[in-house]
Structure formats: structure tokens, C-alpha cells
Amino acid sequence: MSEALLLGAVLTDGGYAKRIAAATGSHFASAERQYRYPLELGSTRPPQSQWTVTGAGSAIVARGGEGPSLTCGTVGKVIDFGVSDANNMGAAMAPAAADTILAHLRDTSRPPEYYDLILTGDLGALGSRLVEDLLAERGVDIAANHVDCGEVVYAPAEDEFQGGSGAGCSATVLNAYILAKMRRGGGIRRVLFVATGALLSTVTSGQGDTIPCIAHAVAIEADGVPQQGGDA
């Protein structure tokens, strides 16, 4: 979702488009069948696994408007931490999220406290703790204002192991919940949105190859004004 927002912002800011729909989604059964085990097989799930969200989200990026603004972004790089377990995506993606957050804060000279919310997704409970630990090792503490989409998309009573995953996880949480709170003035004015992704295929996961991952960050500010125009 963050990649779509970044591309949409670049295209509208450059004058190549007036309005762009940034959208993505995921489906639980499709992800299980392709990357893990068919549901009909009835396989048990390990405790480190997450449940792919069946959902989709879309945001309109335009040169003008009254919505929160996309003020800056950081394109991530591929990080392979050597994790090969397709049931442990949080651990695989956490290093990429940590690297992008660190690069963003360094490039913008901003402390973590600049943002009311640092929203990652979709690391789940395990990956969320890992990204906080990895950044703490580099002297950056985000624990006070960090929330992961995978942790909050399901209610605790649903017992979805480590939480949600999939492209639809961060898309639904951002568009249906966070942006709505920003528009209503719910105490959230500045958000660093860091969606995470795994660059694996059905073949590589079946062969036991390691899972390279990437994360992109985009700053969304309710009171921000883009330097060259372009509201979200």
C-alpha cells in the first residue's frame, strides 16, 4: 500500500495525473493454497504464523483536496535476513521494516517522537517486537508510538496467533481506521506508514529458499503541506 501511495504521489506531483487510486488487497484462502497448505488438507498452524486478511483498501491521491497530505517518503531496499519459513513472515519482514524506518528518520533528521504513530504492516505480534528490538539496538526507540496493522486488525478474542498479514491487512487498517481518525481529529496528526512485503513465490517457498523482504515508508500529515502540491 505504501508503494502505491508513493508512486501516486510522484505521478500527481509531477503533473502526470490529477487523481490516482492507490489500492491493494489479499485473500486468506488464496494465500494459504499458494504458499502454505490447502485448507482442505486440515493442517495445523504453528504458533508463529499469521492469518492473511481477506480485505482490500484504496486511497485517492490528488493534487488538491482537504484530506491528509503525503509530505515525504522513503523507498526501501531488499533485505534478506535468512528466514526461510513461510509461516514466520513477521520475522522475515521485520529487518526490512527496521532498515526503512532507520533510513527515513536519518534522512529527514526527525526523531521517532515527530510522528504520533509509526504504523507498520503486516509484521504481527512477533514481528512487531522484533522491529522494535532491532531499532533499539541502533539507538532508536519507537515502542511508545509504534503500532502494527497485523496486531490490531483482529480482535484478541479471535485468537489469530500472531495476527493478520497480507497486503489487505495494512490497506484496510490505514484506509478504514487510521485515515478516518486523522480526518475526525482523533489525536493523530502525523503518521509514518511503513507497509512491508515479502518477495517470495510459490516455487521458492516450496524449495525452502530464504525470503527477501522490502518495506517502503510514507509520511502522512493532517496539517502537512507538500512542497510541490499533492494531497492524499
Language model: regions and residue ranges:
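Acidic, glycine-rich active-site loops and adjacent beta-strand->loop/helix elements
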Residues: T24-R33, G76, A195-L200, G224
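Internal helix-turn-beta structural module
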Residues: A171, Y177-Q207
